[in-house]
């Protein structure tokens, strides 16, 4: 059983290719993990040492990502909103992904527990 986890939430309305989705999730995972490393080092260390649990789920829209981000901020969970550079499939500045955590699983689940897996 894991004590910590990280969740990446991608926008289902963008219809990203599998490769594009993978890259956006990777950007989110790395950026949010680095933020946790600086802001919540005990959470980062626990998550890193127990195997770095990651889950990818989907949101319906950009608005939903902002709502989830606000919840994460309210609960003090490190997070990162990803904006695409626009070099391939979508316009520059398009918000594609929100990464939440790593953080305690029970807190992260309060924010993401009702979202569907990709």
UniProtKB/Swiss-Prot annotation:
InterPro entries on file: Pep_tRNA_hydro_II_dom_sf, Pept_tRNA_hydro_arch, PTH2
Source organism, top-level taxon: Archaea
Keywords for this protein: Cytoplasm, Hydrolase
Coiled-coil intervals: none
Compartments (UniProt record): Cytoplasm
GO cellular component, one term: cytosol
GO-annotated molecular function: peptidyl-tRNA hydrolase activity
EC number(s) given by UniProt: 3.1.1.29
Top-tier EC class: hydrolase
UniProt key word Cytoplasm: yes
PANTHER family, per database record: PEPTIDYL-TRNA HYDROLASE 2 (PTHR12649), PEPTIDYL-TRNA HYDROLASE 2, MITOCHONDRIAL (PTHR12649:SF11)
Official protein name in the record: Peptidyl-tRNA hydrolase
The organism's taxonomic lineage, starting at the top: Archaea, Methanobacteriati, Methanobacteriota, Thermococci, Thermococcales
């Amino acid at each position: 059983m894991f004590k910590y986890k990280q969740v990446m939430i991608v926008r289902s309305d963008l219809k990203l290719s599998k490769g594009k989705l993978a890259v956006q999730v990777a950007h989110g995972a790395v950026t949010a993990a680095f933020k946790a490393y600086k802001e919540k080092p005990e959470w980062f260390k626990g998550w890193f040492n127990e195997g770095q649990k990651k889950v990818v789920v989907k949101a319906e829209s950009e608005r939903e990502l902002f709502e989830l981000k606000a919840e994460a901020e309210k609960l003090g969970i490190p997070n990162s909103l990803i904006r695409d550079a626009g070099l391939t499939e979508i316009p520059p500045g398009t918000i594609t992904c929100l990464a939440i955590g790593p953080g305690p699983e029970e807190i992260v689940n309060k924010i993401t527990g009702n979202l569907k897996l990709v």
